[in-house]
């Protein structure tokens, strides 16, 4: 899967251009399948999660979520959620990370433990997903 929420984890489309991008985004999140909905309710804390996408390959199965998008200047801050299970492992791992979409640049950043924003590795499709995120608040 694509890198999302950390070194050994998967990337969010999640994670979008508020006021700087066209009003129309070229991408929309997938509809959450019932299987992922049940797992999310069991594994991700709290309410308000929006399913973004899921993937599966020989090494990992994962789904990405976001919630609470809030425009802050030329960015959109949000919580990114990840459900992850590595091949051969019976248990799921969930992570919630503070992230932001840098609308003007079409990229994502992750908030480090010291409160500083650091670049988050992008992947194919990140910029279009950033446009969608930035159109939400």
Regions from the language model: what does each represent?
Residues 23-137:
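N-terminal secretory-pathway/extracellular module detecting exported/lumenal segments
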Residues 8-19:
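Bacterial N-terminal signal peptides
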Residues 1-4:
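Positively charged n-region of N-terminal signal peptides that target proteins for export
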């Amino acid at each position: 899967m694509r890198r999302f929420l950390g070194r050994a984890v998967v990337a969010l489309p999640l994670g979008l251009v508020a006021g700087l991008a066209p009003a129309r985004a070229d991408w929309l999140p997938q509809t959450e399948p019932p299987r992922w909905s049940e797992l999310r309710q069991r594994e991700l804390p709290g309410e308000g999660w929006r399913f973004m996408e899921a993937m599966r390959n020989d090494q990992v199965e994962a789904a990405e979520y976001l919630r609470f998008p809030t425009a802050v200047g030329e960015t959109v801050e949000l919580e990114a959620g990840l459900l992850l299970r590595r091949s051969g492992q019976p248990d799921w791992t969930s992570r919630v990370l503070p992230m932001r979409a840098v609308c003007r640049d079409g990229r994502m950043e992750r908030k480090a433990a010291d409160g500083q924003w650091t670049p988050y590795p992008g992947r194919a499709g990140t910029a279009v997903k950033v446009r969608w995120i930035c159109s939400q608040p």
